UniProtKB/Swiss-Prot annotation:
Family statement drawn from the similarity comment of this UniProt entry: Belongs to the FTR family.
Catalytic activity: N-formylmethanofuran + 5,6,7,8-tetrahydromethanopterin + H(+) = N(5)-formyl-5,6,7,8-tetrahydromethanopterin + methanofuran
A GO BP entry: formaldehyde catabolic process
Name of the protein described by the UniProt record: Formylmethanofuran--tetrahydromethanopterin formyltransferase
Major enzyme class: transferase
Presence of the UniProt keyword Magnesium in the record: no
Pathway note: One-carbon metabolism; formaldehyde degradation; formate from formaldehyde (H(4)MPT route): step 4/5
Top-level division of the source organism's lineage: Bacteria
């Protein structure tokens, strides 16, 4: 398969089951909603070392938020429910409770309920007050700028993590330009995040390592500087490879985001140095969700 001169490899991405939640952060204005949400979703690129994977899903108009203020929705993913609940509580307490004018609400109603303000309320030292509105409980916690309003719980659902594709280009600037175009398109798709910095990964990994203590190591087959030292997947003209990783609330959401991103990257075409699209294929060792590139782009 070739799209605008870009070869689409006959391969697939592998992804794995996760647990996820969505929360809504509001504030006096969008700038401060972003400050809180960006802090809450920081250091959350990979569950390998960060405890969770998280990112901002989209901005919300006042008409879309529970308190009628500007806001953003954020998605958080972890391998299990206990881990997700702990990460959410820690991040909410350290990054949203602390942020001026912020409030925090559930973004998913269904599924197992995990604490949001249920435990954060104790920061109020007995001065906290609960309110029940429309069958939902909220906590008003006194803080120095006024009150922090936080919904008691949010819903946790089954989700999918680790969808991905690789962009292979003639140069680093060209690979990055294609990634930026892809991310811009993918951010229009609901229910997904691309958790790495700017949505892009340069240090793609393979399972295992020559060092016994490492569960993953550099994907040497796709490293352009190692063409003469390893079983390379790269042809001579490829000098840069970058990866986009996607977490989604369903496999269908990830497939939509992958299609949008690949279409955008291929829009630049071979004339702009984009030569191939591939994916992280680990022979079925990583996860049960398989995203075949050519099926997605058919």
């Amino acid at each position: 398969m070739i799209i605008n001169g870009v070869h689409i490899d006959e391969t697939f991405a592998e992804a794995f089951p996760m647990r996820a939640t969505r929360v809504i952060v509001t504030a006096q204005n969008l700038k401060w909603a972003h400050h809180a949400a960006q802090a809450m979703t920081g250091f959350a690129t990979s569950v390998i070392a960060c405890g969770c994977e998280a990112g901002i899903e989209r901005e919300l108009d006042p008409a879309e938020t529970p308190d009628g203020r500007p806001g953003v929705s954020a998605l958080l993913f972890a391998m299990g429910g206990k881990g997700l609940a702990k990460q959410l509580e820690t991040r909410a307490g350290q990054c949203v409770l602390t942020s001026p004018t912020s409030a925090l609400f559930a973004g998913i109603v269904e599924g197992e309920q995990i604490p949001l303000g249920k435990n954060l309320r104790y920061f109020g030292d007995g001065f906290q007050i609960s309110k029940r509105i429309g069958g939902k409980r909220y906590w008003r916690i006194p803080v120095m700028d006024g009150e922090f309003l936080c919904q008691e719980t949010t819903g946790m659902i089954k989700a999918v993590g680790g969808g991905n594709f690789l962009i292979l280009a003639e140069s680093q600037p060209q690979a990055l330009a294609a990634c930026e175009a892809a991310i811009e398109a993918m951010r229009r798709i609901p229910n997904v995040i691309m958790p790495f910095p700017g949505g892009v990964v340069r240090s793609g990994s393979k399972v295992g390592s020559k060092y016994k203590t490492l569960p993953a190591s550099t994907n040497d087959a796709f490293c352009p500087t190692l063409k003469g030292q390893t079983r390379t997947e790269l042809s001579p003209e490829i000098e840069s490879v970058m990866e986009i990783v996607i977490d989604g609330l369903s496999d269908a959401d990830i497939a939509k985001a992958m299609r949008a991103g690949i279409e955008a990257a291929c829009g630049l075409g071979a004339a702009n140095g984009i030569r191939r699209i591939s994916a992280g294929n680990y022979g079925g060792k990583l996860g049960p969700f398989l995203f075949h590139l050519r099926e997605i782009m058919a």
